[in-house]
Amino acid sequence: QASEVLAVSIGPDDAQQQLRNALAMGADRAILVKCEQPVEPLVVARAFIKLIERESPLLVILGKQAIDDDSGQTGQMLAALWDRPQATSASKLELQDGVARVTREVDAGLETIEVDLPAVCTVDLRLNEPRYIKLPDIMKAKKKPLDVTELAALGVDSAPLLQVLKFEPPPQRQKG
């Protein structure tokens, strides 16, 4: 249903490989926002807002949580900054007549909600199974546009606002 699929990643140069994979899976173009150091969810959301202002998407889809820090905050922060509705942890997503119908798993079963577009949707791994990438698609992906910009070029400050005080293992369990 989408007129265009744009894949975006924020990270170091080697994140281009994940974007090339997204292009090989069917994305039309990609943008890498280059940033060598780890960034907090709010920084990512602020960078996405700058891209949203430029691209005007109807739907922004993100994973429900980041793999590097397991935070799960970027989607909610993005929706708040964009002042648009959000649906989280989607395991099924349908678009029709300017509305996104989202089904997600909750403790009591399945919950279905509708949000008006434009919107932000965070998705669960059950949403779909990634496409197998074929060699011809890999070759075509090399010719698709992959723009690279710097986080600073978007006018986003990447200075951390959070400070990790310590990491420690959980207490050992008692035997018996």
Label for each model-derived stretch:
Residues 1-176:
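N-terminal glycine-rich FAD/FM-binding segment characteristic of electron-transfer flavoproteins
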